[in-house]
Amino acid sequence: DGAQRAALPKRGDLVVAEASASQDLGPVLALPRSRTTGRRWGPRQMQGAAHRPDPSGRGMLNLDDGPASKDVLIVEHRLGFVMANAGVDQSNAADPHGPPLALMLPKDPDASAARMRDELHRRLGCRVGVVINDSFGRPWRIGTVGVAIGCAGLPAVLDLRGDPDLFGRSLQTSILGYADEIAAAASLLMGQADEARPVILVRGLKKDAPHQSAQALLRPAGEDLFT
């Protein structure tokens, strides 16, 4: 409704929405304290809530050893994302003085992005791309960054192999995580705390490449050097 009043977005724009703004959120998870580890959620809850049931070689890694890794589980989510605590997050989920709750990732972020794109077209008559983003930590790096967990109406990756560099040499391995780059840039404006900016409009980016879902950003297990 706000977009209609402001006559935004326009054809060719991109809309980046944080996971909590999508209409396909996973269930809210109650967090009884684990009797064995003291964390508010344990491996059984993680597996039941989000862990991919079919083995792919990555599985679940419990990082309980040492203070730096307290209360962390590295999990392959059922959507294919390898992430801390399966993306279960208490930030902005509920009043801290109320019962402990956490939000899970959307059930199907790509479908959420497609529905948002279609609804914007229905209401405004313009075709836009949509990225659903969430904050991820990164191995060997401090700090979280925005990552695309769903997208529709834009390329998720841009294959630059074969394109010339400044000196005419053909690029050999360069594949750009296009949707991730957009998600990270938008995350700077969204913020991580009480900024309350769940949707960001991106203008001026246009790439003539096949549209893909965010699944195109996932490296196949057979190409994973860490598996």
Predicted regions and their residues:
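N-terminal and secondary-structure boundary signal
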Residues: D1-T227
